[in-house]
Curated annotation (Swiss-Prot):
Subunit structure: Homodimer. The RNAP catalytic core consists of 2 alpha, 1 beta, 1 beta' and 1 omega subunit. When a sigma factor is associated with the core the holoenzyme is formed, which can initiate transcription.
The species this protein was found in: Vesicomyosocius okutanii subsp. Calyptogena okutanii (strain HA)
Alphabetical list of CDD domains matching this protein: RNAP_alpha_NTD (cd06928)
Molecular functions per Gene Ontology: DNA binding; DNA-directed RNA polymerase activity; protein dimerization activity
Name the record gives this protein: DNA-directed RNA polymerase subunit alpha
GO biological process per UniProt: DNA-templated transcription
First and last residue of the signal peptide: none
């Protein structure tokens, strides 16, 4: 008789701590022997290749037609400026692409903090990063295109996209994850020895914390492996609940709460699509969501209260099987 997956130990997130500037350590245990390296490799590769983020993908600098130019009154040449722009760490909170402007006269250093948002809801995570240095007679105006994406996108792959006149395409590293490593130590549970403890060290660009990143990776891996699940391994035939078994209020889309755009986008980024998904989250869960602050949390609580609902509610057998298949 084949063993059930239920016989395996289920690991827990036992530690999530910050060890330095944008550096985090996450510990998962206990894991069955060998699963430390199996999950460690999968998590590491997915963190580096498949996380969503934002990057500067195109720049137009007034008076500059190509990247091999120099600019009067500017210390750096254009190639150096482009390299600096690749390291700009920002997040667009309400849109997936936007154009922003930097317009400065010398003498001064141009930094990420000099980006003019023009009403766009944008958060910068390395405002002191120097982009260029201008002398007494220097003047620089540039238009940056910031775009959402996944992983790494070479400029050459965007040759078919419409570019601005004088626009220079940049290789874009969208991932908010800069570095990932892991180690596997021995662990034990009561009399059971030879188990694994997985230690994951993560360095980010500041736009995401480690615990949120791990949860996103787990969701990605779960979705990718879902087609391989063998339903015949389930030991008992269980009658799965359908939408008819739940309060219709719980089946309504989060959009029906008429939240602000920022709050709604934050929830969708965490794959919270239905009110039933939302009310099972605690306040702490929501506050760990990137870009969702106390103001957005209070808004969500107020709207739920008006409907007689509250956060931290446990819904047995959620979600209904027909909702999962949509």
């Amino acid at each position: 008789m084949q063993g059930s997956a239920r016989d395996f130990l289920k690991p827990k997130l036992v530690e999530s701590s910050q060890t330095g500037v944008n550096e985090f350590k996450v510990i998962l245990e206990p894991l069955e022997r060998g699963f430390g390296h199996t999950l460690g490799n999968a998590i590491r590769r997915t963190l580096l290749s498949s996380m969503t983020g934002f990057a500067v993908t195109e720049v137009v600098i007034d008076g500059v037609m190509h990247e091999f130019s120099t600019i009067d009154g500017v210390q750096e040449d254009v190639l150096d400026i482009l390299l600096n722009l690749k390291e700009v760490s920002v997040v667009l909170n309400t849109v997936e692409t936007a154009q922003v402007v930097i317009d400065k006269k010398g003498p001064c250093e141009i930094t990420v903090a000099d980006i003019e948002t023009n009403g766009i809801d944008i958060t910068t995570f390395n405002p002191d990063k120097v982009i260029a240095t201008i002398n007494d007679e220097g003047h620089m105006r540039m238009t940056l295109k910031i775009t959402a994406g996944i992983g790494y996108d070479a400029a050459a792959s965007r040759t078919d996209e419409a570019s601005s006149i004088g626009g220079m395409q940049l290789d874009a590293s969208f991932s908010p994850i800069k570095r990932v490593s892991f180690t596997v130590d021995a662990a034990r549970v009561k009399q059971k020895v030879n188990l694994d403890k997985l230690n994951i060290m993560i360095e980010t660009n500041g736009s995401v914390n480690a615990e949120v990143a791990i949860k996103r990776v787990a969701t990605i891996l779960q979705e990718q492996l879902s087609s391989f699940v063998e339903l015949e391994l389930v030991e008992e035939e269980v009658s799965l609940p359908t939408s008819e078994d739940f309060d219709p209020q719980l089946l309504a889309a989060v959009d029906e709460l008429e939240l602000t755009v920022r709050s709604a986008n934050c929830l969708k980024a965490e794959q919270i699509y239905y009110i039933g998904d939302l009310i099972q989250k605690s306040e702490q869960d929501l506050l760990r969501t990137p870009n969702l602050g106390r103001k957005s949390l209070n808004e969500i609580k107020e709207v739920l209260t008006e409907k007689g609902l509250s956060l931290g509610t446990n819904i047995e057998n959620w979600p209904p099987v027909d909702l999962m298949s949509e």
